[in-house]
Amino acid sequence: MREVNSNTVIKEVEQIVEKACSRDTNVFGYNIWTHHITQVVKIGKKIAGRFNADPEIVEIAALLHDYAGIKDHSLHKEHHMHGAIEGGKILKDLNYPEQKIEAVKHCIRNHRGSVPGKRGTPEAECLASADAIAHIEYVPSLFYLAYAKFDMNIDDGTDWIRKKLNRTYKKINPELRYLIDEKYKSAINLVAKKEAQL
C-alpha cells in the first residue's frame, strides 16, 4: 500500500464534509460548516497540545464528528455511531492507515455530551471539549438551530438551548473550563428562566 499524505487526506475530508453541508438535504444549513465544524477544527487544533493529542487525528475527527447527521438527518439521534461508520468508510477509501482510522472513529463515537461514553484517549477528550467550547463560543448558532431550523417557539427554544449549554459545559475537560467560564455564564444568564425585572 502506498504512503498516504495526511494533508491530502485532510483536504479530501474537508471537501467531502463541506459539500455535504452545502446540500439542500442538510437540515442544519450551510451554517453548520461556517459556524460549527470549522470552529471545532480550529479549537481542536489549538487545544491538542494541552492533551498531548495527535493534532491530525483531532482535525480529521473534528471535520467528521457531525457528518452523519448532516448527510442524513434521520441519523442525527445516533450521529456519533453512524458518523464513526461513515468516517471510517471515507478514510478507508482515502487509504488512511487503519490504526488512525480507529482512533478517529473512537473520537467521533465519544464526542457527545448527551450520550455517556468513554473518551479514553487524548484525541477523544480534545474533540469532545472542542465541540463543547464551539457551542458556547458561538451561541447564536444554537439560537439559529432552535428558531430558524427547528421552528421552536420561544419557551421551547430557550429551554432547549439552556439544556444544550448545560450538557455542553459538563463535557468540557475540567482543566479547560476556565477558558470559557465567563462566556458560559453569560449565555446561561441569557436563557435563564426569570421574570422581567423592570
Regions picked out by a protein language model, each given a short descriptive name:
Residues 3-23:
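Short alpha-helical hairpin
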